[in-house]
Amino acid sequence: MRVAKLKEAYPTAKVELWTEDEHRLGLKPVLRKVWSRKGERPTVKVHQRYQWTYLYSFVRPHTGEVHWLILPKANVEVFSLALEHFAKEVGAGKKRRRILLVLDRAGWHTGKEVRVPEGIHLEFLPSHSPELQPAERLWPLSNEGVANRYFEELEELEEALIECCVALSDQPEIIRSYTRYHWWPKVA
C-alpha cells in the first residue's frame, strides 16, 4: 500500500489520504423535480448558454474535511495552481505532513507539465472508474445549491456555489457520510 511506503519514507511525518476531483457547472441550468400543488405545473426560467466554471474539491474522507476552489478551466496549468493552493492550505511540504492525493486519470492530472508541490504525492485510480472516486459523490450536494435557478452571469452562479460550499464545509459529518466508503483505507 502506498500509504505504508510514505510512512516508511517519512517516519516522523503525518501521512494523510485525500482525494480530488473537478465538476463543471455553467449557465446551462441544473434541473430537478420539485413538489407542487395538484393541478399546478412548476416552471423554471431557462436560457441555454454554454459558459462554464469548474468546482475543484479536495476532500479527506476519513474526517470530512473539504477544500473547495472555483476556477475558470480544467487544464494542466490551472490544476497545478489548484495543487499549489491546496498544499499551502493544508501545510503539506513541511517535514511533518505528507498528503497522498487520489485522483482520476483526467488528462490534466497525468500531464508531464503538472507541477506537484513538495509534500503532495499523487496516486491514480484505474481508468474509467468514477465509482471509485469518493469526491464524485460531492457533486449532487453541490448541485443542490444551484438547481432550478436561473443565472444571468457566471459570477451569480459562482456566488451561489460559494454559499453552498461554505455550508457544506461546515458539515463534515455529511461530507464524511458521502465520501467515506467502507473499503477506503482508514489512515488517521
Q: Language-model segments: which ranges?
A:
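Short functional hotspots at interaction and active-site rims
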Residues: 1-188
